């Protein structure tokens, strides 16, 4: 498989990234939707399952990125989704590429800037 997209609910991306990675070709890519409401702990999720705190958004994005790097992905890009989730959650698109030489920690963007722009725009 050269490319996969991942959009999961009620489960963390950290539970599905490795199995999907194992199906990819050596330079295969993934675009996955980071949904803060399913990555953050219950204590960080507000009314109606909405996460409004920018710091929590930054935290869960960093957690998913750290995990992706730890299992051998290169981080290509991060953008916020122009469409909010059904309850109003801001979500993020993370573009990954399988990195055959191990981990690759060059992250070409600032998470905080993307989260700030998402909250200003949406």
Put a short name on every predicted segment:
Residues 1-3, 15:
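A short acidic, Gly/Pro-enriched loop at the edge of an enzyme's catalytic core
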Residues 8-9, 34:
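Glycine-rich, N-terminal phosphate-binding loop of Rossmann-like dinucleotide-binding domains
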Residues 14-31:
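A short glycine-rich, Lys/Arg-flanked "PGG" loop and its adjoining helix->strand segment in the class I
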Residues 35, 88:
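Residue-level signal for inorganic ion chemistry
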Residues 36-53:
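Short, glycine-/aromatic-enriched active-site segment of Class I SAM-dependent methyltransferases
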Residues 57-71:
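Short alpha-helix
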Residues 72-82:
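Conserved S-adenosyl-L-methionine
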Residues 89-122:
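Flexible, glycine-/basic-rich loop-and-beta segments that form/coincide
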């Amino acid at each position: 498989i050269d490319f996969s997209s991942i959009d999961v609910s009620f489960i963390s991306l950290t539970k599905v990234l490795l199995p999907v990675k194992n199906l990819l070709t050596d330079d295969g890519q993934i675009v996955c939707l980071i949904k803060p409401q399913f990555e953050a702990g219950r204590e960080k999720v507000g009314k109606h399952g909405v996460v409004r705190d920018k710091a929590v958004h930054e935290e869960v994005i960093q957690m998913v990125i750290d995990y992706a790097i730890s299992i051998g992905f290169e981080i290509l890009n991060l953008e916020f989704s122009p469409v909010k989730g059904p309850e109003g959650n801001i979500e993020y698109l993370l573009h990954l590429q399988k990195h055959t030489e191990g981990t690759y920690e060059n992250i070409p963007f600032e998470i905080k800037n993307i989260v700030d722009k998402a909250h200003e725009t949406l």
